């Protein structure tokens, strides 16, 4: 078991948060990680942050982790996608670089179900037609 003193001497893993995440999500990381932020949609800023040496990067939809970004990342071990799809991650390039890619495939199940129920209720009550009539002044 690692003592508190030994843990303080060990460098914390560096996590790059490349897009805005909720404070609760960032809070989960706590003080166990060295957290850095960048604008993942800004290509130059992303590449510079990746070149600085990070262990993990947290992304959403706007950040493109293609072969160039993966190649620029020194020491990167994990690409974590806060969301369902992985279309913005070059999986073959990450695999070749031995980088673990993870996502949250069930993160929007409740929201999707709520939206489906709301659409069914709107359809049952003819809300789209009523809205159109109201806007037309009828």
Model-derived regions, located:
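Phosphate-binding beta-alpha-beta segment of Rossmann-like dinucleotide-binding domains, i.e.
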Residues: 97, 105-138
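An N-terminal-biased, well-structured beta-alpha scaffold segment characteristic
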Residues: 2-102
């Amino acid at each position: 078991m690692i003592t508190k003193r030994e843990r303080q001497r060990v460098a914390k893993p560096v996590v790059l948060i490349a897009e805005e995440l909720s404070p609760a999500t960032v809070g989960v990381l706590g003080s166990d990680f060295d957290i850095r932020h960048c604008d993942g949609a800004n290509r130059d800023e992303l590449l510079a942050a990746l070149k600085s040496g990070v262990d993990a990067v947290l992304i959403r939809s706007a950040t493109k982790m293609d072969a160039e970004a993966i190649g620029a990342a020194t020491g990167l071990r994990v690409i974590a996608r806060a969301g369902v799809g992985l279309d913005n991650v070059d999986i073959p390039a990450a695999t070749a670089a031995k980088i673990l890619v993870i996502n949250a495939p069930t993160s929007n199940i409740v929201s999707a179900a709520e939206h489906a129920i709301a659409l069914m209720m709107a359809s049952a009550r003819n809300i789209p037609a009523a809205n159109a009539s109201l806007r037309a002044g009828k």
